[in-house]
């Protein structure tokens, strides 16, 4: 009899655990996917699959390089054949044409460089039909690509002029002294080196590793673009090289100040309008209504701002003048459009975030930091514990602005993948989905959401758990599947406690969710194949925020498992 009872208890325990499995988990554990063979595709089908996530990007790179090559070639041929420049060609040789052709490419790049960082302009453009043709979400990538082109052709221009200055010095018997004079006392020389210094200062602090190590340094040095554009405007106005025949160049001090400013004036005007708009938006009444300290050094800031409309998946630029007057940092909104406030979850990892958290009253060094708690409420609120009411520092908010995650409702199936604090873009989206399920006002194409969250430690689940619990409770149709993965090594005592508490339970011992926690890293092969099997034919959007390496892996799997009848469309956060 005891043997029967043991068997019956074990059977009920397994039944209880299985009842918590999501449809995708059941399919993956059934072994059905292990025997599925990859479909053989025709060349046309392979091309169509390649076009889904790679084609437009590769096409853009090709067009970008082609245009630059054409501009350089046009400039070189023009200056090589122009009759009025024969004397210059005789003095300097081919490096004269190279320098001038590189300058022409720089004109082209300088005309483009500011448009991608005009955030309001990009957000408005995302709402037009052009968004289906131009990938406005790649605005930062385009800005970086253009910047590297400016660096490359600036050095081509500089090195070519080194030879030109050497030729002048040699033909006038001035030696190395003459070479130095031409470089550092001539108008084109000293303005060029000033621009080059500003440019390299911006570039060297913008590379990913230095930028992440010290964002404040990146922020301040990037404003040397003002120096760059100012000297760019006068760099060509010194008329150091005159044409052989009229019309002759008119130098500074008489009638002209050059024409280089004409190339960046349009982007510069829009960017200036953006900065003015930022200051005007900052004048709207904005204040912090509540501050919540979460485990894992996460600070939640709830903000009230007049005249602000948001959409799920958007982000803002946040400034706290008490910490820094000039710095604006990007944070993804974790509040839903349906809520009467906007919120961000700020991970305290750098100087700026550490100082902001301190100013807000967060104390992460305390022993009771393993539970979420309210640490501050706006002093005008009389409905809370007086001990929590305080005068909170003033903040400025610029935005909100669009992002790739904003497109989550465009697809029939959406796969949301967040690693650690990278879950923040999906907090807003999941909340909005929850509101739409409970208070339906408009139809949406979205019918299924897979949310995958990968964390290293137990505390990472704490601050987000209440939202996930609310979603599970209301999601009677199982439209949202939650898959949590714990990647940290588990101590023996912790593992024992988990097994005891999880046995015969209808909730997970770690998260409190109905869906069980998975240990280790996700098997992306099985996950992508399972989603495709369950939903073909359909189109799934894959949205990710987290480490670059994992993003590259997911990008590869999106390409690998797209086929006729089912497409995985790749999307990633860009700030």
Question: How should each PLM-predicted stretch be described?
Answer:
Residues 43-280:
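Membrane-embedded alpha-helical bundles of multi-pass integral membrane proteins
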Residues 138-162, 226, 419-452:
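Classical protein tyrosine phosphatase
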Residues 3-10, 326, 344, 349-353, ...:
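Reductase modules of NAD(P)H-dependent flavoproteins
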Residues 1-51, 485:
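Extended, low-complexity, polar regulatory segments
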Residues 233, 266, 270-318, 330:
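Membrane-proximal cytosolic interface modules of multi-pass membrane proteins
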């Amino acid at each position: 009899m005891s043997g029967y009872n043991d068997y019956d208890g074990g059977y009920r325990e397994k039944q209880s655990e299985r009842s918590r499995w999501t449809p995708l988990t059941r399919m993956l554990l059934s072994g059905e996917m292990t025997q599925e063979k990859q479909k053989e595709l025709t060349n046309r089908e392979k091309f169509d699959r390649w076009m889904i996530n790679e084609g437009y990007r590769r096409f853009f790179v090709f067009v970008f390089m082609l245009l630059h090559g054409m501009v350089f070639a046009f400039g070189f041929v023009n200056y090589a054949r122009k009759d009025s420049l024969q004397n210059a060609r005789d003095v300097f040789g081919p490096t004269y044409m190279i320098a001038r052709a590189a300058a022409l490419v720089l004109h082209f790049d300088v005309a483009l460089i500011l448009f991608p960082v005009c955030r309001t302009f990009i957000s408005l453009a995302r709402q037009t039909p052009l968004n289906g043709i131009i990938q406005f979400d790649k605005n930062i990538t385009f800005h970086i690509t253009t910047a590297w082109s400016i660096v490359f052709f600036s050095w081509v221009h500089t090195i070519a002029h080194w030879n030109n200055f050497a030729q002048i010095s040699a033909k006038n018997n001035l030696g190395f002294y003459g070479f130095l004079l031409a470089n550092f006392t001539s108008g084109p020389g000293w303005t060029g080196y000033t621009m080059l210094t500003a440019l390299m200062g911006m570039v060297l602090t913008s590379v990913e590793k230095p930028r992440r190590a010290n964002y404040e340094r990146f922020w301040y040095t990037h404003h040397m673009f003002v120096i760059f554009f100012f000297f760019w405007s006068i760099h060509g106005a010194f008329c150091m090289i005159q044409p052989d025949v009229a019309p002759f160049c008119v130098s500074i001090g008489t009638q002209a100040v050059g024409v280089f400013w004409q190339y960046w004036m349009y982007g510069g005007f829009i960017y200036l309008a953006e900065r003015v708009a930022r200051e005007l938006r900052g004048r709207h009444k904005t204040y912090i209504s509540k501050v919540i300290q979460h485990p894992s050094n996460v600070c939640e800031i709830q903000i009230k701002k007049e005249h602000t409309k948001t959409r799920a998946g958007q982000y803002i630029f946040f400034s706290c003048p008490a910490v820094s007057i000039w710095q604006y940092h990007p944070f993804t909104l974790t509040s839903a459009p349906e809520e009467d406030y906007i919120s961000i979850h700020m991970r305290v990892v750098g100087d700026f975030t550490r100082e902001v958290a301190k100013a807000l009253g967060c104390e992460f060094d305390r022993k009771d930091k393993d539970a979420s708690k309210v640490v501050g409420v706006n002093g005008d609120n009389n409905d809370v514990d007086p001990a929590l009411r305080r005068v909170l520092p003033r903040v400025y908010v610029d935005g909100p602005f669009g992002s790739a995650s904003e497109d989550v409702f465009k697809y029939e199936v959406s796969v949301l993948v967040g690693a650690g604090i990278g879950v923040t873009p999906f907090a807003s989206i999941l909340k909005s989905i929850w509101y739409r399920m409970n208070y339906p006002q408009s139809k949406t194409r979205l019918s299924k959401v897979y949310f995958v969250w990968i964390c290293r430690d137990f505390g990472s689940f704490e601050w987000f758990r209440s939202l996930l619990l609310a979603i599970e409770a209301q999601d009677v149709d199982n439209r949202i599947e939650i898959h949590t993965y714990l990647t940290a090594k588990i101590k023996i005592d912790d593992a024992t406690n988990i097994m005891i508490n999880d046995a015969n339970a209808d909730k997970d011992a770690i998260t409190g969710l109905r869906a069980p926690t998975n240990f280790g890293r996700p098997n992306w092969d099985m996950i992508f194949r399972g989603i495709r099997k369950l939903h073909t034919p359909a189109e799934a959007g894959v949205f990710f925020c987290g480490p670059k390496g994992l993003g590259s892996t997911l990008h590869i799997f999106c390409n690998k498992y797209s086929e006729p009848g089912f497409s995985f469309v790749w999307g990633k956060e860009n700030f």
